[in-house]
């Protein structure tokens, strides 16, 4: 078990800010019931599930293919379990540009999602809410999926465990994946075509802890940049970029991503400047995240390491408005975590670390906050500085 390689990418709200990027007409669609035997999956840039810890404690947790461990937010842990026993300490790295000290609870942890259950000896306790916001109590990873074939239906909002004799439809495309060395990480092949026509046929780590489509790691980016393929990128520094601390990304729009023979055109991706962590690992070309897989019906065979993809109703949906800021939900406000250098938000006077009380008059605690999904082309931010509220208007990029 290699806890240092556990991956989380911060839940930054760049394009959809406080919700996912579902189009307005899709919001009004009548919600269909999930199939019998399936469990609800709420997709909001991450895949959220109702998890039962130790048979009786409900938690809202993210499924992260970049993790081999059960992680529990330290605030949730303290309020629910009190002072733990059999505790240890360890340094943990992830999407941030470094490592951070975490607590290990080796008292044994059973948990279930729907009718499926799993037990792990150890849980990692750390401040996840500074990364993910206050909507998640923790995350679970690949050990829960051992020996299973699992459907992740982003458009339908459910996860389903396939029965042993069930056949996968012929309209799915099978992609043979591989492990990262002997570590349980899913490496998936895909192609990235840049605006100058150059195509990278690469191997990418499947990381459902990352909300974006794709991020090139720094080793791959340095080579491509030297060859002149990463023109017109724009830089953003994150105060909290994931486990391990800060992160520096560069945003650019590419011609297309091709996966399983299907191409998605005009996609905004990032490349990393990190020197440490998951985004500096030269054993793969980068990370591929939820926003890409949300365009498909996905079945993962965790026995044979095969991913099956079928385009869903959101396959051709354009990316939503891009804003030059990233902020994290924190109870009664949003905290500005990053600003695009020279972007509209920075020029309008927004600062990293600012506390946003409301967006277009809507607070994060309001029941009608879904009106911000998707965000309009212009945002009026109520920013609290000291005892004053400052109004800042930000246009999309």
Name each region found by the language model.
Residues 11-19:
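Hydrophobic h-region of N-terminal signal peptides that target proteins for export
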Residues 1-7:
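Bacterial N-terminal signal peptides that target proteins for export
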Residues 18-397:
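Pepsin/retropepsin-fold aspartyl endopeptidases
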